[in-house]
Amino acid sequence: MAKLYFYYASMNAGKSTNLLQADFNYRERGMATMLWTAALDDRGGERAIESRIGLGADAHRFDAGTDLWQRISAAHAVQPLSCVLVDEAQFLRRDQVWQLARVADAAGIPVLCYGLRTDFQGELFEGSAALLGIADSLIELKAVCHCGRKATMNLRVDDSGAAVRAGRQTEIGGNDRYVALCRRHFSEAMGQ
């Protein structure tokens, strides 16, 4: 039976790298995969998914209006898929997570989702909350805080490096905008 997996972590834990390695493992064995990432995250440029260590791959892009069940099942009818991999899964809508569960349950295709658990204020993203609720398997990937502890929080910083305490939930950026911290150092930086 195929499953819905959620690999979650803070920034800089290697989520995209893990996704690209899993994709390579399937393709190396001659199996077809389908990669997805959020349309609003354009940091990869030409390559829709790109890791900090330089690996990258083309991917389909989803937005709030994408019917993932329809798009994936249509592709599967043309060429059987062995796996669907979704990067930036925190940006999925709740109904899209249920569509991915249907891909696993009805089409029998494993779905591997990778994303952040929480935003810069420690709040769950809609997609992450839905995945934490219904995924068959939850796998935490580890990042490291500057103190050596496990980093579980994402601190947003401004141009001078000061903690940002308010703002939109979604602001695309990498190491220049976010710092992965343990809860203790996140709390200190946020003045809590």
UniProtKB/Swiss-Prot annotation:
The lineage of its organism: Bacteria, Pseudomonadati, Pseudomonadota, Alphaproteobacteria, Sphingomonadales. The keyword Cytoplasm applies. Zn(2+) binds at residues 145, 147, 182, 185. The gene is tdk. Its EC number is 2.7.1.21. Keywords: ATP-binding, Cytoplasm, DNA synthesis, Kinase, Metal-binding, Nucleotide-binding, Transferase, Zinc. It is an enzyme of class 2 (transferase). Coiled coil: none annotated. The active site is at 88 (proton acceptor). This is Thymidine kinase. GO terms for cellular component: cytosol. It comes from Novosphingobium aromaticivorans (strain ATCC 700278 / DSM 12444 / CCUG 56034 / CIP 105152 / NBRC 16084 / F199). Its main location: cytoplasm. One of its GO terms (biological process) is thymidine metabolic process. The keyword Kinase applies.
